Amino acid sequence: MLYKNINEFEQVIDKTKRIMCLDFGEKKIGVALSDKTNLIAIPHSVYVRKNTRKDLGGLYGILIENDAGSMVIGLPLDLFGMGNELCDKVMLFANRMIKKYAINIYLHDERYSTAMATRVAKLANIKRKESQKIDDKIAAVLILQQVLDMVKIYQM
């Protein structure tokens, strides 16, 4: 099922499984996973997109291999919180993933995540050429950590 409300998503999370996060892009998708306690976001990989069918299978494979039970996908709203063409593509992708694999997906506002990822890399003295290779998975980590922190608050 697709969730836009963190409180509703928190109620359906399988606490025995990890959570996977995607920073969705036209050419690449950043992937991050929670640790087994669902407290810490860990970078996983940058998935290079092929076509929708292969992308669905490849990303679902990562989910299964890492014993994840649900997914977070960054929703790239504009600066005013409005949807755009990429948001529509994210929604379509999420709905296809749900239809094919029956998993719970939470869409999280990812405004500024790529800019923050670039800044994190810069602060870590990673050269721009190198950071471009990892920005997507850093962005996925930042998105997932926000969600994990929000879930932790709802569980208190």
Swiss-Prot record:
Quick one: signal sequence residues? none
Cysteine disulfide links: none
Q: Which InterPro entries match?
A: RNaseH-like_sf, YqgF, YqgF/RNaseH-like_dom, YqgF/RNaseH-like_dom_sf
What one GO molecular function would you report for this record?
A: nuclease activity
Cellular-component GO terms for this entry: cytosol
Query: What does the similarity note say?
Result: Belongs to the YqgF nuclease family.
The protein's name is Putative pre-16S rRNA nuclease
**Source organism per UniProt:** Ehrlichia ruminantium (strain Gardel)
